[in-house]
């Protein structure tokens, strides 16, 4: 193995969170790419599908205290393990159409909660990057309710306000 500071092995963490049920992860690697799935907080992803294939929307939830405590603990484990992290928050991990909350304001609310909590600010020393994510299939900004150019501009602006400038 050739030493390559700042590069090396990447670990992908498929991190599924739900109201009252966000696990603590303990990953390592030079870079831990965290896909943080918050679909269980979104009516567009936590509903039910009838036998005829009709989707019935669920309920939108704010991100809860356990979410923040346990994601922080997971980030802290990465710091302890000498890892850097890259993050994408998303409402979908399976390629589902329209996984977002009922309103775009709720998407913006989730971003504002992350900012107000200081989650990214407190770990900016180990953050390699934060993807805008959130909307569309896999958080890739296609196949969703809020993937028009206008919504993307609002999303980028909200994320620029949320993510520490140093990142």
Language-model features, listed with the residues they occupy:
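N-terminal substrate-binding region of glycoside hydrolase catalytic domains
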Residues: 1-71, 94-96
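Active-site neighborhood of glycoside hydrolase catalytic domains
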Residues: 111-113, 147-167
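Structural preference for beta-strand elements that scaffold enzyme active sites
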Residues: 31-33, 82-86, 127-131, 167
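Alpha-helix N-cap and loop-to-helix initiation/capping positions
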Residues: 59-66, 99-110, 146-151
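N-terminal/domain-start segments enriched in small and hydrophobic, helix-friendly residues
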Residues: 71-94, 98-105, 121
């Amino acid at each position: 193995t050739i030493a390559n500071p700042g590069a090396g092995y990447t670990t992908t963490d498929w991190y599924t969170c739900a109201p009252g049920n966000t696990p603590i992860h303990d990953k390592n690697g030079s870079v831990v790419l965290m896909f943080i799935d918050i679909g269980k907080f979104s009516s567009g992803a936590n509903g039910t599908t009838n036998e005829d294939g009709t989707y019935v929307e669920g309920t939108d939830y704010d991100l809860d205290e356990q979410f923040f405590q346990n994601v922080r603990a997971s980030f802290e484990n990465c710091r302890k393990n000498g890892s850097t992290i890259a993050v994408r928050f998303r409402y979908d991990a399976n390629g589902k159409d329209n996984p977002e909350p009922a309103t775009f304001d709720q998407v913006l609310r989730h971003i504002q909660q992350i900012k107000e909590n200081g989650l990214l600010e407190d770990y900016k020393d180990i953050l390699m990057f934060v993807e805008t994510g959130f909307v569309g299939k896999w958080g890739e900004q296609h196949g969703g309710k809020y993937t028009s150019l206008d919504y993307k501009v609002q999303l980028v602006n909200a994320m620029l306000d949320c993510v520490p400038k140093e990142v």
